[in-house]
Each structure stands twice: as structure tokens, then as C-alpha cells.
């Protein structure tokens, strides 16, 4: 909702994060949420998934450095935790589990982990004031009608008055975050 940005005097800059963003004006804050988000794309386009995450983050960190921003927030993912010990349901920020780097679906998780590392490196070497937020899978307004992730399937079933059908045995639990709750 662009009107919400304008109401607070914020300017939304739209561009392709795979290219450096030509911004002439001063920049105070950067909120970096650009990412490939569809699991199907992680598997069908793992190289592009990784490069979008890394190059996009690099370009925004360079912009933050050049403009000497007051702060930058990188929206990462709880997927950086990988597979953690099932005995510990309470995961801390320092609890990194296993991610198989050779599994193509890991392109998203590994890309996010590496981007967090890049943020830390820019903070250390160039003093870029960057913070990281690890979000659960986020959904909300603006999702494509063709979206096939579970929350979209459930929403479609609810809107049609149909039963919600699980395509698994139902034993897995997942965390979801509504967009406005993340903001």
C-alpha cells in the first residue's frame, strides 16, 4: 500500500536489486526484503535464487555504505537455522542446524545465511549499521492467485467454503507471519 508509505513521508524506491540502484537523493534507512520466495523457484532456479539474494544484498549494502544511512534492516529467514535438534523446540539465534548445501532446495537457506554473513562483514569492515530480522514464512495481501504455497491453498479453500485438505500426514508444524504483523 503505497499510501501508507507516503503518509509517513517515506519514499519507496523500486528497482532491480540485481543491478546497482541509481539513487541521487540522500537515504536515511533501507529495508531490504527483496528475495525469491517461492519454493518451486528454489528448486527450478537455484542459481538465480542464490544470486538474487547475494547480489541484491551486496548492492543494497553498497548503497547503504555510499549514502551513509542511519540504519539498514535485512529481512532474512528462520530457514537459516536449518534442521535443529528436535529435542530443543526453543531455538536461540545462535542455534544453527544442518543444511545440506548440495540439495537444490537449500539454495534459499544457504543464500540467506550467506547474505547475513555479508551484512556482518559490511558492518565490521565498513561500519554499515545493518541489522538482521529472521522472519517466519510471511504472507499477506498481494499474493498471486496462482500461488500454491500452503497458506494460499488454505485461503482459497476458506473463500470457496471448501474443506482444508492437507497433502501431508499433518505431523509437521510451521510458523507463519502475516505481512502487517512483520511491519
Residue ranges with predicted function:
Residues 10, 14-52, 66:
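NAD(P)H-binding glycine-rich loop region in Rossmannoid oxidoreductase-like domains
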Residues 77:
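Residue(s) in the substrate-gating loop at a strand-loop-helix junction
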Residues 64, 123, 158, 166:
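Hydrophobic pocket-lining residues that define ligand/cofactor binding sites across diverse proteins
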Residues 9-11, 129-131, 165:
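Conserved beta-strand segments of alpha/beta enzyme cores
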Amino acid at each position: 500500500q503505497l499510501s501508507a508509505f507516503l503518509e509517513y513521508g517515506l519514499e519507496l524506491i523500486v528497482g532491480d536489486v540485481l543491478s546497482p540502484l541509481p539513487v541521487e537523493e540522500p537515504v536515511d534507512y533501507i529495508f531490504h526484503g527483496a528475495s525469491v520466495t517461492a519454493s518451486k523457484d528454489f528448486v527450478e532456479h537455484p542459481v538465480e535464487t542464490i544470486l538474487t539474494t547475494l547480489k541484491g544484498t551486496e548492492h543494497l549494502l553498497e548503497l547503504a555504505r555510499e549514502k551513509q544511512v542511519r540504519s539498514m534492516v535485512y529481512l532474512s529467514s528462520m530457514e537459516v537455522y536449518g534442521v535443529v535438534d528436535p529435542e530443543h523446540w526453543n531455538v536461540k539465534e545462535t542455534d544453527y542446524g544442518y543444511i545440506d548445501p548440495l540439495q537444490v532446495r537449500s539454495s534459499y537457506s544457504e543464500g540467506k545465511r550467506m547474505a547475513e554473513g555479508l551484512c556482518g562483514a559490511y558492518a565490521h569492515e565498513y561500519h554499515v549499521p545493518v541489522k538482521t530480522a529472521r522472519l517466519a514464512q510471511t504472507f499477506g495481501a498481494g499474493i498471486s492467485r496462482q500461488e500454491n504455497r500452503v497458506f494460499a491453498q488454505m485461503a482459497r479453500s476458506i473463500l470457496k467454503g471448501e474443506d482444508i485438505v492437507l497433502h501431508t500426514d499433518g505431523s509437521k508444524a510451521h510458523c507463519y507471519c502475516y505481512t502487517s504483523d512483520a511491519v
